[in-house]
Amino acid sequence: MPRRKQEQPKRLPSHVSRQEEAEGELSEGEHWYGNSSETPSEASYGEVQENYKLSLEDRIQEQSTSPDTSLGSTTPSSHTLELVALDSEVLRDSLQCQDHLSPGVSSLCDDDPGSNKPLSSNLRRLLEAGSLKLDAAATANGRVESPVNVGSNLSFSPPSHHAQQLSVLARKLAEKQEQNDQYTPSNRFIWNQGKWLPNSTTTCSLSPDSAILKLKAAANAVLQDKSLTRTEETMRFESFSSPFSSQSASSTLAALSKKVSERSLTPGQEHPPPASSFLSLASMTSSAALLKEVAARAAGSLLAEKSSLLPEDPLPPPPSEKKPEKVTPPPPPPPPPPPPPPPQSLELLLLPVPKGRVSKPSNSASEEESGKPFQCPICGLVIKRKSYWKRHMVIHTGLKSHQCPLCPFRCARKDNLKSHMKVHQHQDRGETFQCQLCPFTSSRHFSLKLHMRCHQHFLRTEAKVKEEIPDPDVKGSPHLSDSACLGQQREGGGTELVGTMMTSNTPERTSQGGAGVSPLLVKEEPKEDNGLPTSFTLNAADRPANHTKLKDPSEYVANSASALFSQDISVKMASDFLMKLSAANQKEPMNLNFKVKEEPKEGESLSTTLPRSSYVFSPESEVSAPGVSEDALKPQEGKGSVLRRDVSVKAASELLMKLSAESYKETQMVKIKEEPMEVDIQDSHVSISPSRNVGYSTLIGREKTEPLQKMPEGRVPPERNLFSQDISVKMASELLFQLSEKVSKEHNHTKENTIRTTTSPFFSEDTFRQSPFTSNSKELLPSDSVLHGRISAPETEKIVLEAGNGLPSWKFNDQLFPCDVCGKVFGRQQTLSRHLSLHTEERKYKCHLCPYAAKCRANLNQHLTVHSVKLVSTDTEDIVSAVTSEGSDGKKHPYYYSCHVCGFETELNVQFVSHMSLHVDKEQWMFSICCTACDFVTMEEAEIKTHIGTKHTGEDRKTPSESNSPSSSSLSALSDSANSKDDSDGSQKNKGGNNLLVISVMPGSQPSLNSEEKPEKGFECVFCNFVCKTKNMFERHLQIHLITRMFECDVCHKFMKTPEQLLEHKKCHTVPTGGLNSGQW
């Protein structure tokens, strides 16, 4: 048997076919160990051959062996790797591990020259090297790794003292095994309570192999429990206390060694393989070799136990050289080497690899908490802190965990909630910020600032809210600071905020007015009084209750200023008026002082003549009242209220806004648009009492008198309540739309009947051109005196002077002058007069290239830019006569120009030049100059002149070409003018005064303008849009046109830039004749 044991490896060289090797293993497996007993190792070996086909063994042996390795080492190495792949899931990982292990095992065995020694001797060397390898791994890495992970390049370190003792013990056991080649265990031991107990019955006695199986099962159970807990929560792996504690390992080894020494030579009974077969190197070795292996692994276990106590080694259990075997399926991800349940020591070696890999997440978790970056599993963003990572995850989850306790507002971030809570803090303190141009209200001043950007055409001042601070002064605290006033103003829920637009006429207001409050406060005081007469349905006492917002239609109607639009105005006029309004709105704050100073005069004059004050809106007209009779003033009440009211934009916008109230005024007033006319005409001689609520003029009187009587002399409220109601842009556009509809209907209805017949200033043609809101009486005087004859020019001048006595008069640019034809509004009377000529005068400036006709030269010049030509003559008569000349004038011109492209013919050079500029470059020279007296045709202007001078000398006619520059007569004359200075000098004569196009034809010659040395707009080039102010620049510019057209073909009149190009071009005309006339050009 020993001989067969030594010869068996010869049958398994690496180059032998895998089928033969498998057959040999199967046939002689029972006698492999030289004993007749079938130990669990032998049975396991046979089971491996049955379960795993030869294909797996082929792959393993190809990777693990080479032809040079000793036969003794090849077999255990290949089978050890083969057993690793018991699990199909771990097959690929195990194969990778085999690649690392095989070279190491082979290198350990290659050193042995005696390859024919018994297998146990070679195995001893392998196990000794394995123990050294495990010791080195435990000391170097501080964690258990199987030999698979150690690799062949592991530097061996001296084993510990305890490991060396175990190695010596294992070596002695191996030597005793060699002496007893055949042995059969006679006595069996049973592992019970940490000790090996002898069993009397041989049938039930345990061999060392079976004892190790028991130990393995116990270790497996512990590992399973540990692995289950590892999956649930990451924790540090602790070395197993059973069965390989420091005491149990040594006692087990002692018992096993004693058992081996007492082993008898009689074969023992065969033990069936366990459910999970124990497959390891022990399956191919004797029991002594197995004990040796167990000793080595026990040493590794102790080393791992010691290394686990080190702070840097959170990793698990004892090392072992053994290849991983089938691990009972634990929840943690199986590591590359997990095979069947091995002996206790083997299992301890296997699970270090899984445990090590499972423990890495726990390590990483602890590292993350200590500062390792967090990564978002959705977008992959790496975040440094856990709190930031949680905040980032809200983006993906959409969770808004922060709820405002006062409102439904929710947010994901705490800082957003804090900023939101400030809104409630402002509300609790009564702080509100309201826009003065629209109903927008915000509890944050910054939001109001942002909102004010929407009002691009209105005054944008961040101090609007602060300007309303004087409102608390109305309550009796004029000396409060701005902040205090602001707080009080907001406590009222925004009621005080709107005080600037409408305020009550209570004695508190008036008393505050006398207290020397800021001008803003003065502006607020009279607004409610101006808007509401005492006799009106809306009492002033009711005002404070609603003065937060005056959106009620009755309040709109209360301000009878809406009648200002009773006259006819078109949509365009209204839009222009709004544009003026927006522009003037920005100037309004600067005009506040003017209004305050002007109204004291009103108060003084009104105290003496109350009836007259009903129509007065401007200080000039009010001052003139004392010298004017009541009858003289009465017809102008409606007119003065409309035409003389000074509109500083806000007033105008207020009037526009109040137009919307016309639909609601049926229950409160007579129609405003009609009644003033009747009252002015019928009751002009009757003195109207201020208490009467008859018409528009009376309402205006009430507005102006009552509040002014209450006001002190030093303080006067503004003359109107500006923007008393907030209107948005959309509201204004709707009002304009309604206005346009009403205006269009009434304009068609009343223009024929009323405008020319009534004496009302609203419909007077002259005054209608002026702005209805004009404050300057001088502008209105001519129409007033013509219509009524009651106010003379000296009186109006006196009014202006008196108004200017210490009070600045309103500027003219604040006035508006609408056109009664098209509705366009102008800021100056002169502009309106010039505009009106467009509706009446004849369009005598006609375009010679299209049917367009203009009434002024500027418009025609602007139109001609479309045709790429400009008229530079300053003589309007010449231009008109030249453009409007008809074909009958051909008798005066000896020749005319004809276009070959479209057939256009004209005697005027300017028309022909501008016409040819409309064609493409190639077509611009397809023309001819024809004689009117005969059929002579040429393309050169000089030739036609010579022809006329020789053939038609008797006809004394001046031609346009004689009075025009040759370069302006035709583009081809540029070359002539450049080459002949005489022609250019003769062409500069100003014979007819009709030159329309003026250019300089020679670089040295000076351009001559027909009537002026320099036109209004400078020197303009006829060939392009170039305009300059000096002659030198103009001459330099003309060189561009002269040079580019210097070399012209006399056949096709095409210009070349260089003589060489012209010579080359002329060849195309002379080739058919066979000669080149290049010299004659």
UniProtKB/Swiss-Prot annotation:
Keywords per UniProt: Chromosome, DNA-binding, Isopeptide bond, Metal-binding, Nucleus, Repeat, Telomere, Transcription, Transcription regulation, Ubl conjugation, Zinc, Zinc-finger
Glycyl lysine isopeptide (Lys-Gly) (interchain with G-Cter in SUMO1) cross-link, chain position(s): 673
Location of region: Mediates direct interaction with RBBP4: 1-14
Motif RRK motif: chain residues: 3-5
Compositional bias segments (type: Basic and acidic residues): 1-10, 947-960, 979-988
Molecular function as annotated in GO: DNA binding; NuRD complex binding; zinc ion binding
SUPFAM superfamilies cross-referenced by the UniProt entry: beta-beta-alpha zinc fingers, Formin homology 2 domain (FH2 domain)
Keyword tRNA processing: no
Annotated consequence of substituting residue 4 to A/K: Decreased interaction with RBBP4
Region (Disordered) location: 1-77, 259-278, 307-348, 947-996
Pro residues bias: start-end ranges: 327-344
Compartments where located: Nucleus; Chromosome, Telomere
Outcome when changing residue 5 to A/R: Decreased interaction with RBBP4
Amino acid composition bias (Polar residues), ranges on this chain: 62-77
Cross-link Glycyl lysine isopeptide (Lys-Gly) (interchain with G-Cter in SUMO2), where in sequence: 176, 216, 226, 360, 372, 466, 475, 523, 549, 580, 587, 597, 634, 639, 658, 673, 704, 710, 742, 778, 798, 870, 891, 958, 1014
Keyword Transcription regulation: yes
Top-level taxon of the source organism: Eukaryota
Zinc finger (C2H2-type): 374-396, 402-424, 433-455, 817-839, 845-867, 897-919, 929-952, 1019-1041, 1047-1069
Protein family membership: Belongs to the krueppel C2H2-type zinc-finger protein family.
Role played: As part of a ribonucleoprotein complex composed at least of HNRNPK, HNRNPL and the circular RNA circZNF827 that nucleates the complex on chromatin, may negatively regulate the transcription of genes involved in neuronal differentiation. Could also recruit the nucleosome remodeling and histone deacetylase/NuRD complex to telomeric regions of chromosomes to regulate chromatin remodeling as part of telomere maintenance.
Subunit-structure text: Part of a transcription inhibitory ribonucleoprotein complex composed at least of the circular RNA circZNF827, HNRNPK and HNRNPL. Interacts with the nucleosome remodeling and histone deacetylase/NuRD complex. Interacts with RBBP4; the interaction is direct and recruits RBBP4, a component of the NuRD complex, to telomeres.
Protein name: Zinc finger protein 827
Source organism (scientific name): Homo sapiens (Human)
Gene: ZNF827
